[in-house]
Amino acid sequence: MRTPGPLPVLLLLLAGAPAARPTPPTCYSRMRALSQEITRDFNLLQVSEPSEPCVRYLPRLYLDIHNYCVLDKLRDFVASPPCWKVAQVDSLKDKARKLYTIMNSFCRRDLVFLLDDCNALEYPIPVTTVLPDRQR
């Protein structure tokens, strides 16, 4: 009996399970995911520790990576006074620092700012979904 050559074995290996992420994340996708994660974590922190003074006085944190003011917002957030009692604040500041570094150095050429409205980061417009007439 003849043993199979290397070609069938190679084809079997290549036809195996596909990779979980076929393409690496881009600068834009990394910035977008990290900004959404930071905004979500900030909102959870506001709900879980609302009475803690250092949480209550943190700068508001709504991030829109298409708004030029987001860089100032991140810098202000990272520079806010330390919060020794709530470890999540330090974790959040580390993520904000990481996003600022990514936006300001690694991905600077990939950024396209569509807005320069700092008030939009303070008081974001809530996203509403309007259903088409047939789904009402």
Swiss-Prot record:
GO terms for molecular function: signaling receptor binding. It is found in: Secreted. Keywords: Secreted, Signal. Specifically expressed in CD34+ hematopoietic cells. GO terms for cellular component: extracellular space. Residues 1-22 form the signal peptide. The keyword Signal applies. InterPro entries: CYTL1. Its main location: secreted. One of its GO terms (biological process) is cartilage homeostasis. PANTHER family: CYTOKINE-LIKE PROTEIN 1. This is Cytokine-like protein 1. It comes from Homo sapiens (Human). The lineage of its organism: Eukaryota, Metazoa, Chordata, Craniata, Vertebrata. The gene is CYTL1.
